[in-house]
Regions:
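Transmembrane alpha-helical segments and their short flanking loops
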Residues: 2-24, 266-274, 299, 316, ...
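Cytosolic juxtamembrane amphipathic/interface segments immediately preceding
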Residues: 14-37, 76-77, 173-181, 328-330
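Early transmembrane hairpin of solute transport permeases
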Residues: 22, 26-166, 336
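Alpha-helical membrane segments and immediately flanking helix-loop junctions
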Residues: 25, 93-103, 120, 271-339, ...
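Interfacial/capping segments of alpha-helical transmembrane domains
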Residues: 45-73, 204-226, 245-258, 362-371
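Alpha-helical transmembrane segments in multi-pass membrane proteins
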Residues: 46, 92, 96, 100, ...
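Membrane-interface helix-loop-helix junctions at boundaries between adjacent transmembrane segments
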Residues: 111, 127-227, 239
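Generic multipass alpha-helical transmembrane bundles of integral membrane proteins
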Residues: 191-308, 314
């Protein structure tokens, strides 16, 4: 009697890895923060379109600082800045709404009233000047209030849920329309949320937004140092080799920092200053071009492989890889639980992060300040996200093809040899007649 064993496909391996990390990915607060920031991408891209237009170079001469916004009608240019100010200038407001909405949905709440009260609470905490009470108070409505937005959103929604879950609300008879019933249900928790934050900000005079800004102004630069970048990206690559979604894992912790850095760069450019923050989610396109591990050269090698199985994997992975999606390679080669491919996968990520960071430190490329769809081919993507800096496209070619191409080649040959030897054993065994 024989027992058939079925090999798991790359999709099954991905599902297994995701199952291991499910408790982290599905933790309501972390998942809501992640989903809230991801939902901001359309707003960031729309605001970035203004920068793309106004920062379009009008001269290709070396050292020229002439941009389209400088030579067009200045009244029109001023009006074009309005969409930028309405997106990046109110970024923390939108994050408050987005995170609170995501958390309210995860907590099983009708999100309309919880989100409204959370928005009001954030405005009390982050923009007291708008109330007319303190005309000198700082406002934290742009990227400077991102972490305040997270804190206010999470606490406010949990307070709302506390009252609803324990039925500490005003309930209406069964025949009352749902919209009216929900309005009365929201009354008590909404009162507690609004006046709770009012007490903290105005009676106790505790400036949460200002305090968080001071603290995080120390933390964010540390989290953006080379050491932090190298550690985070190496961990990200290692997790992928274990079948765990590395991008989601580190993104849960670092997405707010990436977004804050990108928004700070965009604001700097809008104010006529040079962008300085290096570690953004857009910077990571230098680190993981073609997908984590920069596997696009490996896909090309697979296509020319002597092993039929690797050729199939190569053709499956080459087209998604051009658009920075490489799960067919990661789980089809496989890289997962395969030291022959896992070691270069991690090494390439580390080297790419090092080379890209060093290029920024030496001022060889412009830091990213424009949000763009990450599925664009990496050289084009980096050219756009740096405000048409051709050097960024060159660096992207180096980190996508040159460095990975050199490192993947010996690993590919070693793995191809193992696959061919295995196929030589399996083919005769399959062709052998069964014994009577």
């Amino acid at each position: 009697m024989t027992t058939a064993t079925t090999k798991k496909g790359w999709a099954d391996r991905l599902a297994d890895g995701m199952e291991v990390m499910a408790p982290i990915f599905d933790q309501p607060h972390l998942a809501s923060i992640r989903d809230g920031f991801v939902a901001m991408m359309p707003l960031l891209i729309i605001g970035a379109l203004v920068l793309l237009i106004l920062q379009f170079p009008c001269s290709l001469a070396e050292g020229s600082n002439c941009y389209l916004g400088d030579i067009m009608d200045q009244d029109l240019a001023a009006k074009l800045w309005v969409p930028f100010s309405a997106t990046y200038g109110l970024l923390s407001v939108f994050v408050t709404i987005s995170v609170s909405y995501a958390l309210a949905k995860r907590r099983g709440l009708d999100p309309v009233m919880p989100v409204i009260f959370t928005f009001l609470a954030f405005m009390l905490v982050a923009a007291p000047r708008l109330t007319g009470y303190d005309a000198e108070a700082d406002q934290f409505l742009d990227n400077t209030g991102l972490f305040t937005a997270i804190v206010v959103a999470v606490i406010s929604i949990e307070v709302f849920r506390f009252f609803v879950k324990r039925n500490l609300v005003i309930t209406m008879p069964a025949g009352v329309p749902p919209a009216i019933a929900n309005a009365f249900i929201a009354l008590i928790p909404g009162f507690v949320i609004v006046f709770g934050w009012w007490i903290i900000r105005f009676l106790l005079n505790f400036d949460l937004a200002g305090g968080l800004f001071v603290v995080l102004s120390k933390i964010v630069p540390v989290a953006s140092t080379y050491t932090a970048v190298a550690i985070a990206e190496t961990i990200h690559a290692f997790l992928w080799t274990m079948g765990i979604h590395g991008d989601l894992t580190i993104g849960i912790a670092l997405q707010p920092i990436w977004t804050a850095n990108l928004a700070a760069n965009a604001q700097a450019v809008a104010n006529g200053l040079a962008p300085t923050a290096i570690y953004t989610s857009e910077f990571r396109s230098y680190v993981v071009p073609g997908g984590s591990g920069a596997t696009l050269p490996l896909a090309f090698y697979f296509i020319r492989s002597k092993a039929p199985r690797l050729r199939r994997v190569g053709w499956l992975g080459i087209w998604p890889g051009i658009f920075n999606i490489n799960e067919p390679i990661t789980f089809g080669a496989p890289v997962v639980f395969n030291p022959v491919l896992a070691i270069p996968f991690i090494l390439i990520t580390f080297i790419n992060a090092t080379v890209a960071y060093l290029a920024h430190v030496l001022h060889l490329v412009t830091p990213t300040f424009i949000a763009a769809p990450w599925t664009l081919p990496s050289p084009l993507l980096m050219f756009m996200m740096t405000g048409f800096d051709w050097r960024a496209a060159v660096l992207a070619v180096i980190t996508e093809f040159v460095i990975p191409g050199i490192i993947w080649w010996p690993a590919f040959k070693a793995w191809e040899k193992q696959v061919l030897e295995k196929e030589k054993v399996e083919v005769p065994a399959a062709a052998a007649p069964a014994r009577a």
